[in-house]
C-alpha cells in the first residue's frame, strides 16, 4: 500500500484519499470482468468487457497521460518509409509506400464465391478485401469489386498466371499507396 500512496502523491499534490480508497480506485480502473452468454445448446461464448473510466469529481490515483506522449492518429509510425529516389509517387511500383493490387470486377455473388475459392492460393497473394462497390456512381449495373494485394509484382504476375479467373470477371492491375 505504501507504493500506491507514493504513486498517488507523485502525480497529485493532495493526499486526501485513504489507502483503502486508493486501492478501490486502482482495482476499479485496472480490472476486467468476463461475461458468459449462451449461444446454442451445449456451447457458451465468453466476452471480456472493460470497466469504463471514472468520470466526474473522482480522480484516478495517477494520471497516465503525464507519462505517455500522445500523438495524433494520422501521425502514427507504421514502419512505412518512402524512398527519396522515387520520382512518380502516384504509380511507382518500386516505392515502399505502394503495393501491387488487382481489382476483380463483376457480379457480387460470383466474386464472393471466387474469393472463397482463392483460399487454396493464399501463398500467391497477401490480402483480399470483402466484396465492395462504389456508392456514388450513375452506373445502373452496380458492379462489385474485390481487391487483392500483393507483396511484389512477381507475386501478382504468378497469381494471374496460376489462378483461373472466370470469364465474367474483369481484372484490373494497379498500385495502392499505403
Swiss-Prot record:
Name the chain's protein: Protein E8^E2C
So what does this one do? Plays a role in limiting the replication of viral DNA in keratinocytes. Recruits the host NCoR/SMRT complex to viral replication foci to mediate repression of both viral replication and transcription.
Its organism's taxonomic lineage begins at: Viruses, Monodnaviria, Shotokuvirae, Cossaviricota, Papovaviricetes
The terms describing its cellular component in GO are: host cell nucleus
Matches recorded under SUPFAM superfamilies: Viral DNA-binding domain (SSF54957)
**InterPro entries associated with the record:** E2/EBNA1_C_sf (IPR035975), Nucleotide-bd_a/b_plait_sf (IPR012677), Papillomavirus_E2_C (IPR000427)
Pfam families given in the database record: PPV_E2_C
What organism is recorded for this protein?
Human papillomavirus 35
Where is this gene product found? Host nucleus
Q: Which GO terms describe its molecular function?
A: DNA binding; DNA-binding transcription factor activity
| Keyword Nucleus annotated | no
Q: Spell out the disulfide connections.
A: none
What domain of life does the UniProt record list for this protein's source? Viruses
Q: Which GO terms describe its biological process?
A: regulation of DNA replication
Q: What Gene3D superfamilies does this protein map onto?
A: 3.30.70.330
Family, as annotated: Belongs to the papillomaviridae E8^E2C protein family.
Q: Where is this region: Disordered?
A: 40-60
Keywords on record: Host nucleus
Amino acid at each position: 500500500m505504501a507504493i500506491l500512496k507514493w504513486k498517488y502523491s507523485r502525480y497529485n499534490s493532495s493526499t486526501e484519499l485513504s489507502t483503502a480508497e486508493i486501492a478501490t480506485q486502482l482495482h476499479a480502473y485496472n480490472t476486467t470482468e468476463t461475461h458468459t452468454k449462451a449461444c446454442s445448446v451445449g456451447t457458451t461464448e465468453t466476452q471480456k468487457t472493460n470497466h469504463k473510466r471514472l468520470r466526474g469529481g473522482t480522480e484516478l490515483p495517477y494520471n497516465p497521460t503525464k507519462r505517455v506522449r500522445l500523438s495524433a492518429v494520422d501521425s502514427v509510425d507504421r514502419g512505412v518509409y518512402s524512398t527519396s529516389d522515387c520520382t512518380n509517387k502516384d504509380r511507382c511500383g518500386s516505392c515502399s509506400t505502394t503495393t501491387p493490387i488487382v481489382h476483380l470486377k463483376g457480379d457480387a455473388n460470383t466474386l464472393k464465391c471466387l474469393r472463397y475459392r482463392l483460399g487454396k492460393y493464399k501463398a500467391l497473394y497477401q490480402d483480399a478485401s470483402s466484396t465492395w462497390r462504389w456508392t456514388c456512381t450513375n452506373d445502373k449495373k452496380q458492379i462489385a469489386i474485390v481487391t487483392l494485394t500483393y507483396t511484389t509484382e512477381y507475386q501478382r504476375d504468378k497469381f494471374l498466371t496460376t489462378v483461373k479467373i472466370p470469364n465474367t470477371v474483369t481484372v484490373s492491375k494497379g498500385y495502392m499507396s499505403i
